[in-house]
Amino acid sequence: MTHSLIIEEVLAHPQDISWLPWAVQYFFFIGIAACAALFACYLHWRKKDAATEENRALLIAITCAITAPLALTADLHQTARVWHFYAWPTPWSWMPWGALFLPLFTGFLALWFLAQQIKRLFNKSYNVTKWLALASALCAVGLLIYTGREVSVVLARPIWFSYAFPVAMFLSALQAFFALMIVAARRDSVRLPKILWGQIWTLAALGLVVAMWVSGDTLSGTAIRQWITVALSAKYYAVGWVALWVCTLLFCSLALRHPLSQLRRVLLVLSALALCWLMRWTLLIQVQTVPKFNAQFNPYSLPGGTDGWLAILGTFGLWIALLIIIRETLNGLTRRLQHG
């Protein structure tokens, strides 16, 4: 009796990277926008008046909510076919939920922002505003769940396959939002210590979640540890995470004891934003270099064109421009109304 030897091999065609830097920008800005909307909704439904902080959070939310979809459309393949999500709904997939939540979130948020500015400029309020705030918050929750789960359900990438992924993405975006609120607040603001404590507790929760994720006896945790052991670049990114986390936490701790100068507040927000962005870059782009079938890593070099550095700088430039344009337009209207 003879036994034939069967050799099975997996052959894969070379292919371009699936997600481009545009996707990192989308996940970065939409996370901050969702956290800002949730915080603003909390302030709106409180009994205490916090109109200044609510308007500040709404400004952050609306500018990020405008920037994020533009980055997403640049990353999508065959953008003109986005209407297929609505013509042929597939509710068992996570991406169509994004096509539902994203326009609803942006629309409700824009109406809420306009209602707040009308109240601030003309002292005219609407009962529907609180429901716009609630609708924006619900859509924000949907966006946070969808953006986390559309990645963490991918079993083909074991590093992504974890419930810790969406939690870590949410907490990293929340601490970045708190940093933006800190840098925009007045030094004598009575609510500044509460925001500082909010960021400290968020950073502590983020550190705990990431530590449990990496050290856990799960498929994802094991894959992360193996990646750090084998790939030198993974070690560098891990060191970057820890360094930025420590720097941000240190700046927050110092701010509780002594008021930070404007320079240190800028360094705080840059450190927090860098931590939020680097986590997304590492998990969304660098994880794609981990091989599925072969025994070697797939090196990725960031190009300088519209799919590389230009995309990153352009979206940040757009966001800053929106902040300046909207803020100065509102300030100009305020001065004109005050002086007739």
Swiss-Prot record:
Subunit organization: Probably composed of three subunits: TtrA, TtrB and TtrC.
Ranges in a coiled coil: none
NCBIfam families registered for this protein in UniProt: PRK14992.1
Stated role: Part of a membrane-bound tetrathionate reductase that catalyzes the reduction of tetrathionate to thiosulfate. TtrC probably anchors TtrA and TtrB to the periplasmic face of the cytoplasmic membrane. May transfer electrons from membrane quinol to TtrB. During mice infection, the ability to use tetrathionate as an electron acceptor is a growth advantage for S.typhimurium over the competing microbiota in the lumen of the inflamed gut.
Keyword Nucleotide-binding: no
UniProt membrane topology term: Multi-pass membrane protein
Chief subcellular location: membrane
Pfam families reported for this sequence: NrfD
Name of protein: Tetrathionate reductase subunit C
Family: Belongs to the NrfD family.
Keywords carried by this UniProt record: Cell inner membrane, Cell membrane, Membrane, Transmembrane, Transmembrane helix
Keyword Transmembrane: yes
Leader sequence segment: none
One GO term describing the cellular component: plasma membrane
Induction description: Transcriptionally regulated by Fnr and by the TtrR/TtrS two-component regulatory system.
Species this protein is from: Salmonella typhimurium (strain LT2 / SGSC1412 / ATCC 700720)
Spans traversing the lipid bilayer: 19-39, 57-77, 94-114, 128-148, 164-184, 195-215, 236-256, 266-286, 306-326
Compartments it resides in: Cell inner membrane
